[in-house]
Amino acid sequence: MSRFIDAAEQLLGGPVIPECPEGVLYFAEAGWHTDDGTGVHGVKFAAYFDDLTAANGALRLVPGSHHPEQHARLAAYERRQRPVRIDADPAAYQASIPGYVAATSPGDVIAFDLHTWHASFGGQDRLAWTAVYQRCPETAAERDRTLRSVHDSFEQGFRGFDRDRYPVWRDWLGGAAAHPRRAPVIERMRHAGVLDLPGARDGW
């Protein structure tokens, strides 16, 4: 965890707070999208448990698409391309936006800005572990966006989740004293109001 915190702080240029990490089974394909819906400044780390290439579902990313001006151009372009749907003509949809194929082997970790456009094509079932870190909010507006984003992640992550069969990491908060790197992160979460959100204690 501390390695990811250090990397996130270096990439985002300041202190960070985490969202709940997730273990995810991806299947089929995912069209071009970003992972930010509220305007937060964050980075996502993804580790896949299979060897992935362009042929079997490796993550594809559009370099530079996290910059606002490039994001706006891509969004406008995608709207013009809407008649080309992934289910109607997969090859045409895949070719409609060029992307870098991040081929990976187990043990590799991909880090990308939440605003980066990414997709996956030709996918098989693939298991991944992901963790998101946000830049610690400094203004009331940033705090509001952070809380909405984290709340959304709780809703998606724990709605209908069988916590008895698949326990969450309930000792992360309680065991902070034994991990000096963790304590200041928890204090940032508490100060930002993250730990007051519904579901926060279940998630951590």
Regions found by a protein language model. Give the residues of each.
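Short N-terminal helix-initiation segments at or just after the protein's N-terminus
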Residues: F45, F49-A54, H71-Y77, R188, ...
